[in-house]
Amino acid sequence: MKKVYVLIGNYGSGKTELALNFAFRAAEQGKRTELLDLDMVNTYFRLTERGKMTEMKEIRLVSPNFACSGIETLSVPAEVASAFAMDWDTVIFDVGGDAVGATAVGRYHQDFMELEEGALEVLNVVNVRRPLAGTVERIEKLQEEMQIHARLRITGMINNTNLAGMTTDAELRDGYELIREVSQRTGVPVAYTSGKKEFLDRFLAEGHDPKYIGTPLAIDTYMQRDWDSWIHSLSDNPSNPRPGVYYRTDMA
């Protein structure tokens, strides 16, 4: 049975990193894999920039037109239809970073509904250190909005709480506490807890309730960035509609 993962979440939650990890893991298991970049909101993290890596692993990558050209008006390619029409084992969608971004995947509602029962997982990637995800109420609100715009029911959450190079043991623990409460209030289960192996191992050793951990997922980092340089470039660009918004860590 074809397995389709739709990864959605707020800015800086780590969707793209997880999408790559999901795809690489599937390919290493010998599965025919397609990876689709539908993030029409955040042009900073583009799967296209890892095109050589995906090609080496025989993963088909579908990206927005002009994704690496510096042109900010992106359009969804017609090749997205291949996710449903072709005989893949694993398909991963990396979807835009807010309710508006989730709209890009909403146009394929009928295609998703025609998938075999159990084939689709819609996963909300949550990083409680990022904007709009620092409280239970914020996580719930964004989750509800994304479901409406994506026209898909979220089937699980991923605790991917981190602060990039400043991550400590506190991140996954704090994410666990908030996401556990969201799960209790909404009924949406925690499907995965993800992070670098050293942090994940120490978190798991603390003995938290496995119901709110889901499947532990140790991830590798592929999307390296010079955060300070990028933040300055956003602030200096008058055409940027959200200067500094994506990457502030003091808003949680």
Labelled PLM ranges:
Residues 100-213, 226:
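Conserved catalytic-core segment of NTP-binding enzymes
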Residues 25-79:
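N-terminal phosphate/diphosphate-binding loop that engages ATP/GTP or pyrophosphate donors
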Residues 87-91, 120-121:
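Loop/turn-to-beta-strand initiation segments
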Residues 18, 22:
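Hydrophobic positions on the alpha1 helix immediately C-terminal to the Walker A/P-loop
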Residues 7:
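Hydrophobic anchor at the beta1->P-loop junction of P-loop NTPases
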Residues 11:
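The conserved Walker
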Residues 15:
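Conserved lysine of the Walker
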Residues 64-69, 89-105:
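Switch II (G3) loop of P-loop NTPases
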